[in-house]
Amino acid sequence: MTCIIRASSSSPSFFPSKLPSFHSKPAPNPPLFDLRLLMSIVADPSPRGTDDRRLAARCHAVPGLSADEVIAASDEAFGRHSSPSLKRSGSGVAIMWFRNDLRLMDNEALVRAWAASESVLPVYCVDPRNFGATHYFGFPKTGALRAQFLIECLEDLKKNLMKRGLNLLVRFGKPEDILPSIARVFSAHTVYAQKETCSEELLVEKLVLKGLQQVVLPQGGTSNQKSVGPKLVLVWGSSMYHIDDIPFSTKNLPDVYTQFRKAVESKCSIRGCFKLPVSLGPPPNTGLDQIDGWGTIPTLEQLGLKESKHEQGIHFLGGENAALGRISEYFWKKDLLRVYKETRNGMMGPDYSTKFSPWLASGSLSPRYIYEEVRRYEKQRVANDSTYWVLFELIWRDYFKFISMKHGNSIFHLGGPRNVVSKWSQDRSLFESWRDGRTGYPLIDANMKELSTTGFMSNRGRQIVCSFLVRDMGIDWRMGAEWFETCLLDYDPASNYGNWTYGAGVGNDPREDRYFSIPKQAKTYDPEGDYVAYWLPELRQLPKERRNFPGQSYIKQIVPLKFGNTHQSTHASNGRSENTHHSHVRKGRRQNKM
């Protein structure tokens, strides 16, 4: 199977020559790297050998269903979560501003917009700031692979809206400019959107509110009636546990995950998914002619990118339908949920973990829907440690969102939430060796090549490459975090930066300070060297026991290991999985079953 990936292009860009940027973080250092050069690195796989047929390149689609099977799974899920009895009682026009919630199912903001209006106008703003440079080191904020995944999510969202009587209005520009303008044209009384938690997203919310306050809507009645502008209603909808239901204020959130988990498991219940009306239409009947119609979803070329082909690793299909198809495939067709806890630390293939994280990050998949499907599976098939562990991972995902609210911008700072003072290197040459998979340690190099080729890496791999960068190389952890921001399909600021602070020993939990031994990890999780040989074809001809320890048969090791080759990581067997969110250094022993 041939998969499509994207690399940078010299074609004319969809964006202005000077991209606007956010200013809510401390002043950055000058960019270390050229933006276009890095975009090409993100998605330019090196040539692959084909010597060993068993390790020959193969691309796995996720979900691995046919198009008809995906649609059937999606239709079945929507059928169970739609209600013909829902009634709307509102008037006028409401705008539904889609952000990181690119789905119809269990989208409270969308249902509330529908109920409070006679017609809903769905809007997505292609914000150029999200395609600029990262704050400290000037990497691309959105790499080519995630840009393509986003395009697919938007295309799928548009199709699903059209099936239910609506469409998707797509505009390029800042939401604080676009939404007030559209609200004025359509006389929209309210803009509904999902609430976010991190600084850049919160800044946009403030700017949108300020812009809407400048809009004067036409009023009936007497001439001295007070003018009213459109309201902004932000709805919580990104976590499994609702923020209003957790037994702490964000200010008093525990800094130890286990304390948080035990409290929510014992004191909180998870709300049910919001039912969806059978029809969401009609759209507004006037105003579209004044704004040149619905607009179009940008192509990769318009984003300054082009596509190329690769035949290795995993290829994710974006969109809500694909997400629902993946749940159907993993839980019900392949029956893999029952063994998830035993397989979650794998590194090869599509099915060692759920692979839900890219859809969760884009909001194409509701965590509450996953919860409901786990409970349904437990009733119909089996309830065991594996079914619990998927929920355990979703609680971690929730925790990082709430932690980002408690600690704010400190999760992006060098010293982290605890303001830990440490000496870090920003050696460009060393970092590039890690980034490009040229460290001389096959397990590190293979993982980094998988990341740049596919936009994905196993949780085990994320733990290992993070530990190596910050512990063995002594490199500023923010360089690693920003490179992950560039590459990952499942990038989410709260989880990404929360986890990197943990890995660097500067996170909110003072007990989180661990080292992962590369030899130990290789022997435990890639004992026959299949993973490294898959991504590093020059190792395929070596005996299996030498693939992770090739000596002079491989490139020179760029740094010595901090604890040599005999150190055993006492935490190696307890790493958490990436299955439900973009993790890399998350961990915790299961304490009690839900």
Where are these regions (language model features)?
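Glycine/tryptophan-enriched, flexible segments
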Residues: 2, 14, 25, 32-33, ...
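Active-site-adjacent structural elements in folded domains
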Residues: 176-178, 340-346, 352-355, 425-437, ...
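Contiguous, well-ordered alpha-helical segments that form the cores/surfaces of helical PPI scaffolds
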Residues: 123-127, 354-358, 369, 389, ...
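Acidic/polar loop patches that form or flank catalytic/metal-binding clefts of enzymes
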Residues: 339, 402, 459-460, 476-481, ...
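Hydrophobic/aromatic-rich, well-ordered segments within soluble, folded domains that form packed cores
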Residues: 190-193, 456-477
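Trp/Phe/Arg-rich N-terminal binding region typifying the photolyase-homology
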Residues: 2-280, 449-450, 495-496, 578-594
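Active-site core of glycosidic bond-cleaving carbohydrate-active enzymes
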Residues: 393-443, 449, 459-463
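C-terminal, helix-dominated tail/subdomain
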Residues: 418-425, 431, 435, 472-474, ...
